[in-house]
């Protein structure tokens, strides 16, 4: 059994009932085989893959809080500090009923490579809780966030671990979390990113993941003889990433014809109206049925189906494993030339393989959606220097970072004999930086 297979078998054995974590580790290790085989004896002696796939620290705790009826509620919470080899732990806090330790570990593992790809000094981590902010009053959300931070604050800090927003954790939640951290520590520091502009946040942070996705997609298309202008784009999701991916795609001359939420999806052949979408989702916090009701060219469909429409580029921006094998087949049949992941691991391994086998350009999430964490790191820089950059300054830095990410993953894929395999290129480029740092720092 090869070293890679031994490590994967150990991960499965020691982390039962964590399929998302298994999937993430399998995908990374498989694409690293060419790298590992060049130095297998050294990596085995140093147990480098074992240390890379095992979090440095896993923090599990309960979060008791009181609802509006006076009933005490208790939620499970997690913070997985995966790797600090290249900087303080960095990764979001997810608030969703589906959250469990396996999902947080998968996200933290992916985050390590994504953060490495940015070229910025940030390690990998992730956290969250099975608390659902949907349907809760502001007071209930505040009560949860304050209780959550009362335990979490012991393990984080501007130079230790810097959490951020994620699914379910927006500006409101970050504000409550930051307020409680400041209250407990009496320190005003850049311990969270995604903060409001009035207390240390960065311009362009809200737009960053969606904009960055399009900047990398644009670079990938250009390197393969295509341009984004004039392309028809299918986007899934209707949250932060999807909204600003739609906005930037249209600014670059593409036409986006779909968006989706948890109940259904919209097909709008005239092109998605970004202003209306933002009003429905960000202001009214309503379902997409209201978008369809307000726009004559739009048709609402219940259930899944975003990837059945004819498109040149597909951007899955909703959640993990949303783009399945049958979706990949539909995309290929409809002439799709490129897929770039806006969400974390939204494409199943079977779908990824099918797309690549059929010549579809494929940009994995750890590269394509790194714009969010890159801009979080830029927020950390501004906090450290007590500065605030303009929107255009941050956007220009983001565009350069995304162009560099594509250049690095493209070069890594070519160096190891896999030109055009951006999944392998992203994993290899991310791995090499982390591995070099781990070796330099000794057995820690």
Language model features with spans:
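Glycine/serine-rich phosphate-binding loop and adjoining beta1-alpha1 elements at the start
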Residues: 96, 115-229
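Adenosine-phosphate binding glycine-rich loop
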Residues: 2-24, 220, 332-444
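Flexible, glycine/charged-enriched surface loops at secondary-structure junctions
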Residues: 19-22, 38-45, 119, 156-165, ...
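Rossmann-like adenosine-cofactor binding region
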Residues: 264-362, 367
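Structured beta-strand/loop patches that form or line metal/cofactor-binding pockets in enzymes
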Residues: 42-71
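General beta-strand structural signal in soluble alpha/beta enzymes
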Residues: 160-164, 188-192, 235, 258-261, ...
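Glycine-rich phosphate/diphosphate-binding loop of Rossmann-like nucleotide-binding domains
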Residues: 193-196, 201-310
């Amino acid at each position: 059994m090869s070293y890679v297979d031994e490590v994967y078998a150990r991960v499965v054995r020691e982390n039962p009932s964590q399929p998302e974590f298994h999937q993430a580790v399998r995908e990374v290790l498989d694409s690293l085989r060419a790298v590992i085989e060049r130095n297998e004896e050294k990596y085995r002696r140093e147990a480098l893959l074992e240390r890379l796939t095992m979090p440095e620290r896993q923090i599990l705790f309960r979060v008791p809080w009181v609802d509006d009826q006076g009933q005490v509620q208790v939620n499970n919470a997690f913070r997985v500090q995966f790797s600090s080899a290249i900087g303080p732990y960095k990764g979001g806090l997810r608030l969703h009923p589906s959250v469990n330790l396996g999902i947080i570990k998968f996200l933290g593992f992916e985050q390590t490579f994504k953060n490495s790809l940015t070229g910025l000094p940030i390690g990998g981590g992730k956290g969250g809780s099975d608390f659902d902010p949907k349907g809760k009053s502001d007071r209930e959300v505040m009560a949860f966030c304050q209780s959550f931070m009362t335990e979490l604050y012991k393990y984080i800090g501007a130079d230790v671990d810097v959490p951020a927003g994620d699914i379910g954790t927006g500006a409101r939640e970050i504000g409550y979390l930051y307020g409680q951290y400041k209250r407990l520590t009496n320190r005003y520091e850049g311990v969270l990113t995604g903060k409001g502009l009035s207390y240390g946040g960065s311009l362009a942070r809200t737009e960053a993941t969606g904009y960055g996705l399009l900047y990398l997609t644009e670079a990938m298309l250009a390197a393969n003889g295509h341009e984004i202008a004039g392309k028809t784009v299918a986007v899934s999701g209707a949250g932060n990433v999807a909204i600003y991916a739609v906005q930037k795609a249209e600014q670059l001359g593409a036409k986006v014809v779909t968006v989706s939420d948890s109940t259904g999806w919209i097909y709008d052949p005239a092109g998605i109206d970004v202003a209306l979408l933002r009003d429905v989702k960000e202001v009214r916090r309503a379902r997409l049925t209201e978008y369809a009701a307000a726009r004559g060219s739009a048709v609402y469909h219940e259930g899944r189906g975003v990837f059945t429409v004819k498109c040149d580029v597909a951007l899955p921006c909703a959640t993990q494993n949303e783009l399945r094998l049958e979706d990949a087949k539909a995309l290929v049949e409809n002439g799709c030339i490129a897929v770039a992941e806006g969400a974390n691991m939204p494409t199943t391994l079977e779908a990824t393989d099918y797309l690549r086998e059929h010549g579809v350009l494929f940009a994995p999430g750890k590269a394509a959606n790194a714009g969010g964490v890159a801009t979080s790191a830029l927020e950390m820089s501004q906090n450290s220097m007590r500065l605030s950059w303009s929107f255009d300054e941050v956007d220009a830095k983001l565009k350069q970072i995304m162009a560099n990410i594509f250049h690095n993953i493209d070069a890594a894929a070519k160096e190891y004999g896999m030109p055009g395999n951006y999944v392998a290129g992203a994993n290899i480029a991310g791995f090499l930086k982390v591995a070099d740092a781990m070796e330099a720092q000794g057995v820690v």
